């Protein structure tokens, strides 16, 4: 692991993945990618992690696909014990590296915290997570405390045009055509 002062800590950090369990005894780790194509995580460099509230630059020595997993070798991490210290560390990059999106496409990070409101004005709650289901993405919406339907959370498909009627990231608001009782 590099302890260099450069490269600079990201101004706009975003989580692109997470380091998983160790693999073998030579310091390799599984890595879980949040990018659409799992291997694309390696296109974004430099990587940073946070340990004990401090940013650390992580330099990759190597990576490879092993069965269904991606595994990485971090420079300076040469045994299982050292690799164990990195288990469950989130991998950050500067979000300015991410490509510009087409109209009606959004990064999940930008949707987090948005208020979800039906076309009739009923406030469903706030987006707390997003899930990929294969056919479409799904918003996990934490219901407001006094939800009239007694819901704690809702799963609302992110289908632009069908369910999603309007996204206003400036106002942190997503308008949906969705039955609040569902």
From Swiss-Prot:
Record carries keyword Phosphoprotein: no
Subcellular compartments: Cytoplasm
Keyword Hydrolase: no
GO terms of molecular function: ribosome binding
GO cellular-component term (any): ribosome
GO BP field: ribosomal small subunit biogenesis; rRNA processing
Any Pfam family the entry gives: RimM
InterPro entries referenced in this protein's UniProt entry, alphabetically: PRC_barrel-like_sf (IPR011033), PRC_RimM (IPR056792), RimM (IPR011961), RimM_N (IPR002676), RimM_N_sf (IPR036976), Transl_B-barrel_sf (IPR009000)
Record's comment describing the protein's domains: The PRC barrel domain binds ribosomal protein uS19.
Similarity comment text for this entry: Belongs to the RimM family.
Self-association state and partner proteins as the record states: Binds ribosomal protein uS19.
Protein name: Ribosome maturation factor RimM
Native source species: Yersinia pseudotuberculosis serotype O:1b (strain IP 31758)
């Amino acid at each position: 692991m590099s302890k260099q002062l450069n490269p600079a800590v990201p101004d706009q950090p975003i989580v692109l993945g997470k380091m998983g369990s160790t693999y073998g005894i030579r310091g390799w780790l599984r890595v879980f990618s949040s990018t659409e194509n799992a291997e694309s995580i390696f296109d974004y460099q430099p990587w940073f992690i946070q340990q004990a509230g401090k940013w650390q630059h992580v330099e990759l020595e190597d990576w490879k696909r092993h069965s269904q997993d991606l595994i990485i070798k971090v420079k300076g991490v040469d045994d299982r014990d050292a690799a164990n210290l990195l288990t469950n560390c989130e991998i950050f990059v500067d979000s300015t590296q991410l490509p510009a999106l087409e109209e009606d496409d959004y990064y999940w990070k930008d949707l987090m915290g948005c208020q979800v409101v039906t076309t009739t004005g009923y406030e469903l709650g706030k987006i707390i997570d997003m899930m990929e289901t294969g056919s479409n993405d799904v918003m996990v919406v934490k219901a407001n405390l006094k939800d009239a339907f007694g819901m704690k959370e809702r799963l609302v498909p992110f289908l632009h045009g069908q369910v999603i009627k309007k996204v206003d990231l400036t106002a942190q608001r997503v308008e949906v055509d969705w039955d609040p009782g569902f």
